[in-house]
Amino acid sequence: MDFSSNVAAQLNAGTILPEGIVIVTLLLVLIVDLIGGRKVALALPYLAIAGLLVSVGLLVTSWSMADPIGFIGAFNGDNLSIIFRAIIALSTVVTILMSVRYVQQTGTSLAEFIAILLTATLGGMFLSAANELVMVFISLEMLSISSYLMTGYMKRDPRSNEAALKYLLIGASSSAIFLYGLSLLYGLSGGETQLVLIAEKLVNADTVGQSLGLAIALVFVIAGIAFKISAVPFHQWTPDVYEGSPTPVVAFLSVGSKAAGFAVAIRLLVTAFGGITDEWHVIFTALAVLSMVLGNVVALAQTSMKRMLAYSSIGQAGFVMIGLVAGSEDGYASMVFYMLIYLFMNLGAFSCIILFTLRTGSDQISDYAGLYHKDPLLTLGLSICLLSLGGIPPLAGFFGKIYIFWAGWQSGLYGLVLLGLVTSVVSIYYYIRVVKMMVVKEPQEMSEVIKNYPAIKWNLPGMRPLQVGIVATLVATSLAGILANPLFNLATDSVVSTKMLQTALQQTGETPAIAISHDLP
């Protein structure tokens, strides 16, 4: 009995109960599809969404868990991981809502698509809480391989096949580099796999050989992370994959996959590389500069909506990295807050783009000319999301950027913040260009696509979930601007109550900062 109790205490399996619900949901989707076939196909999205919402509910109830460590230290269900896991699960909910009609129209299996998407969700959720090298890599591969499959899911579309091949080849190389970095950590720490134990062993790495090995490990690990978050110069896959992949997949990659990447970045860098904080701050400063400049400048010249949003996501990653480089409570909290609102405004934009694509079959920005005259509600929804991404007040994106810039300014990153402000203004131009094209064009200047714009039919199978997704993301984007302070307090609480971050801040001499919202006028 004592042995069983000891094993149960060490496993602490309750920490992965939200992921367990997702696993059960995944199995139910496959079993129900196998038994019911096409008769139950339309019920599967609702089954998956119900399971994901239950998982999010369990994440909420596990906030500030007394003992968040599970599976003998491999899983850390602290508040920081809870909020990132919730972001990933919610991004999957919206992705399912927007994908029902899209997948059905292509004639492919909806159940298989949902199953692969849930597998990617599991990988992202486990990655966000991974506290051990083996779990970090296995979770990353679960997310990556599922993403490759979703990217090439439209087998009859040559662009989807090309995107999947590019993503697979570059992603496999990135994973190999990342794994080599992890193997160096394992060797330098004397065979430890838990991040905390690795940090304890490496804190005294004072020999030349150990320091050089740790520097090489840092470079390789950052290369793997930078690929996942689409940071320049590891962004080459992003525009082509975004343009060729199914749009719902692009939406998930831009939010869920990116959130998982930033979650593992914080956990790995702050813990395992806590002894060389200055070094990785320098590297991420360079990545942030390159991402903000290239992402926002190249987006100006794009003619494809998905390709424009691909470069936009690269620029957005650069903004988030300012919070990471700040290395303070406010910096980490601003990262979490920005990912929370980015979830809704970016997925809202993709939901509107999917609706436009379903009606017209076009992805070209020029084809949006005059959309207001045929579909004012879609124009309003897409405009709100794009303006929020650009950081126009009083929308949510404005508060997200101002919190990140303020955190960077407090940490002395004056040049980085000023560059962020300049590139943010540049981004406003290409967002407003689309809005102006939709709204300002005279009726006689409408594109041929808009002139032949079909009437909407919400009674078609799969259209109602898309409608719910659009309305939900628009409402959330609008309310997030009004409720910015409570959301930021939530993000701050996730940082303040996370032992890993507090330990790192004490070691680097950072004093807990006052919440940004209190300093703003």
UniProtKB/Swiss-Prot annotation:
TM stretches of this protein: 16-36, 40-60, 80-100, 110-130, 133-153, 168-188, 212-232, 246-266, 280-300, 308-328, 336-356, 380-400, 402-422, 468-488
The record's annotation in Pfam families points to: Ndh2_N, Proton_antipo_M
Molecular function in Gene Ontology:
NADH dehydrogenase (ubiquinone) activity; quinone binding
Q: How does it sit in the membrane?
A: Multi-pass membrane protein
This protein's GO CC annotations:
plasma membrane-derived thylakoid membrane
- Main location as per UniProt: membrane
Q: Which family does it belong to?
A: Belongs to the complex I subunit 2 family.
Tell me what this protein is called. NAD(P)H-quinone oxidoreductase subunit 2
Query: Which gene specifies this protein's sequence?
Result: ndhB
